[in-house]
């Protein structure tokens, strides 16, 4: 690899703004803010949503009600729901 063309790769703490959960991961981001985490000082990146707060990962996701739309479609096109 050529020197001087790749961004610096470093460990960064990502903090979920909603829950306060912190994750250490590698990144090329260079934030100004730092944080003490597990005895070391890391650059800090604040994120709005992470796997700790996203409904898909927390199991609190909501499914859209398709029942009414399916019935409306069947009625519109004269499809009988009986087998």
Curated annotation (Swiss-Prot):
> Which Gene Ontology terms of cellular component type are present?
ribonucleoprotein complex; ribosome
Entry's Pfam families?
Ribosomal_L31
Which InterPro entries does UniProt cross-reference here? Ribosomal_bL28/bL31-like_sf, Ribosomal_bL31, Ribosomal_bL31_B, Ribosomal_bL31_sf
User: Is Ribosomal protein found in the keyword set?
Assistant: yes
Mention one GO molecular function: structural constituent of ribosome
Would you kindly state one Gene Ontology biological process term found in this protein's UniProt entry? Answer: translation
Q: Keywords for this entry? A: Ribonucleoprotein, Ribosomal protein
The record's annotation in NCBIfam families points to:
L31, PRK01678.1
How does this polypeptide assemble, per the annotation?
Part of the 50S ribosomal subunit.
UniProt family annotation: Belongs to the bacterial ribosomal protein bL31 family. Type B subfamily.
Q: What is this protein called?
A: Large ribosomal subunit protein bL31B
User: Which gene specifies this protein's sequence?
Assistant: rpmE2
